[in-house]
Each structure stands twice: as C-alpha cells, then as structure tokens.
Amino acid sequence: MNKGENMNLEMWVQNISATFPWYAQLLRDKQADLSRLESLPLITEELLTQHYYHAENSFPGEHHSYLTSGTTSGKRKRIFYSDNDQRIYLQQRMDIIRDFCGEGHTRACADLGTGHAAATAGEIFQAMGCDVELIDFTRPIEQHIEVLNRFKPDIFFTMPMILDSLIATGKLDFQPKRIILLGDVASLNWQNKVADYFHIQPAQVLDLFGSIEIGSIAFYNHAQKRYQFDSYVRPEVVPVQSLYPGAKYGGDGGILLLTSFAREYFPAVRFVTNDLIEGFAQENVGGRTVYTYQRCLGRFAGEFKHGEKINLSDISDALANNLPYHKYDLADHEGGLVIRIAAKSIPTEVIEAIKHDLLARNPDIAQMISSGLVGDIRIQCVDAQEITGNVSKRRY
C-alpha cells in the first residue's frame, strides 16, 4: 500500500492476518470486527516476544532485518521490513528531512549508534545529493569529535544523549546549519539550549519520533508547534489505567497505540508502544485528518531508555542475582543510568557483578559506554524513604 492512498482497515487487517497466522487466530479468539479499530486486539510486548521477535518468520518476498536490545526473554529483538516497507520508510524520512533542511547543504554526518535509523541514514543523505560521513559508534568519543571537526557537516543527525556527551567535552569546532535528533526524549527547552550552543535558531533543530518496529512515526512541526504524525500512521492514545490497572499515574498523558499502513512485515495494528503522550489531538486539514501531540514524556512501564533500551526485567534479574530483597528506582545523571538502591552500603564486587550482568545482556550499551558516548551505569546507595515509586510496574 502506497503512502497517501485511501486505506481500508479491514483489507489491511486481512493482509496482516495472511502474513501472520498467529494474529489471524487472535482475531478469531476475540471475535473482532475487522472494520472497527477499537474492536481489534492490542499487540503487546508479551505477544511479540512469543510470536514475532524470536520466531522463525517466513515471508513471501525479500526482506531486511534489524536487531535491537533484549526483551524479557534475555534475547535481542529481530524486526523485519519488506522491500516495500523499506521504500516507504526511506521516502518518508527523506521527504521530512529535505523539507526541513531546504537546499544548499552539501555535507551530512550521522552519529546514531545502532538500529534501523543508523543503518539507513547514509542512503537518505546520499539520495539528497550530500557528501556523507557515518560515524561508527564503536569508536572512542575523541574520534567522533575528530570526524566532526574535520568534516564540518552542514547537517548533523544524532541522538540527544550522544550530542550531550560531545558538547560536554568542550572540543567541538564546527557549526552545523541543521541538527536532526532521534532516539531519546528531547524537550523543547533542551532543543533551545542546543540551538544556542551552535548559534542557530530553534527552528533549525528537528526532533524526529520513530521506533524500530514502526519506522518513521512523527516529527516536530515548527509551524504548528506540535509533533505531527506521519500520514500512514493511525495513532490512538488510551488511559494508562486501561493497560496498567494498578498504575497511580494522574497526569494528562496516555499510552500511545499505533496502527501503520506502511508495515507489511510487522503486525503494526494497535501496537502498544508504551510511550506516554500528552496533548493528543486531531484536526481536518485540506480534507484529511491530521493527528498531532504536544510532547512525549518518555517510556511507561517495562523499559528504561538509555540510548537503546535497558529492560527493567534485566535490571530486576541482575539485582535478584546479586543483591536480592532491596527496593530500588532509576534516574539519569550526566547521560548515564543510575540505579538507586535502598542500602547502607554495597560491596564493590556486588556493584561490579550487577553492572556485568546488565552489560552482558545489552552489548550495544556496553560498547557505547566503552566509547564514551554515554555515561557508565552507576549504583547508588540511598535511604529507603528516598525511593520513588515501583519501577517494576512503570517507568516514564
């Protein structure tokens, strides 16, 4: 199905059912009305772990596969794109980036770590006619700085946590005309600070929203001052308590569900992203419905985003193996994950064992720490009264 085509939900669900028999069975079990989105089952992490991420998927056509960090099973996720999925993704990202950048930019650099966006960034910029430098995330941070200062890109595509680390060195000596961000939550205040640092306007910073499962999802529309969903994505935002009945969240946000009409080789029908979204709205623009939101507060429930994702199940397992029966919560400090544990003291060997277990399950994070792109994992002792919330159930 092509982007912008009038999309028939029932036909699309039938296509997904034909590709994924387990999903067809799910529809039969639920007795779902295929023409009503709200009647369709939710695609959760649990279902995908059982049927997709580690399954021997068989597809009728050529495909591309990408790995991301571990799930509750301890294995890395594998996500598939058909040739058509890939084509639509590349075209959509290129259209957004080209519209943002305009003409006259000849050099582009991507420093994105791992994943689908990192693997395709070079192709997008080359199609725009740019000379391209792709920085290998395994390089030490000094080499990232050397490439940037030598190449002096007009367009710099990176992740907020990487950019923070680069700026903190005080050694950057280039002035990009456009900065494109992807990955971590980048508040407008944070974007403004980045613009000030590089002596550019806030409108010259573009924040993209995407995931390896869906691909391109949304972008910050400076004219609207809101994030705008891509045209082939049908978003829903549902109350937190509808998915997590025990949650005590009382804010204005809700959990984002996504249905994509541009993903043949992923069951993107009411996919539970676990992203907490505020200010969700829709309006009619030129005869078509446009969906927008004010901001993403981060990831709710089972994952703590640390560039890639360090799964809360991994953290729970590491603590259970090495320091059981202690309350804990999580924080960020200087680009690194902090695990705050209710304890008077923790032996050094226990701290190292916890970190070893986490990094063994998340090798991409281990490499990024080694390269100096993100801060090391810290274990901090605190009084039990300082522990905030039950992170085994939620995190945002």
Curated annotation (Swiss-Prot):
One of its GO terms (molecular function) is ligase activity. Keywords: Antibiotic biosynthesis, Ligase. It comes from the Bacteria. Transmembrane segments: none annotated. It catalyses: (S)-2,3-diaminopropanoate + fumarate + ATP = N(3)-fumaroyl-(S)-2,3-diaminopropanoate + AMP + diphosphate. Pathway: Antibiotic biosynthesis. InterPro entries: ANL_N_sf, CapK_Type1_Caps_Biosynth, DdaG_Ligase. One of its GO terms (biological process) is antibiotic biosynthetic process. Its EC number is 6.3.2.46. Involved in dapdiamide antibiotics biosynthesis. Ligates fumarate and 2,3-diaminopropionate (DAP) to form N-beta-fumaroyl-DAP. Can also form N-succinoyl-DAP from succinate and DAP, with lower efficiency. This is Fumarate--(S)-2,3-diaminopropanoate ligase. It comes from Enterobacter agglomerans. The lineage of its organism: Bacteria, Pseudomonadati, Pseudomonadota, Gammaproteobacteria, Enterobacterales. The gene is ddaG.
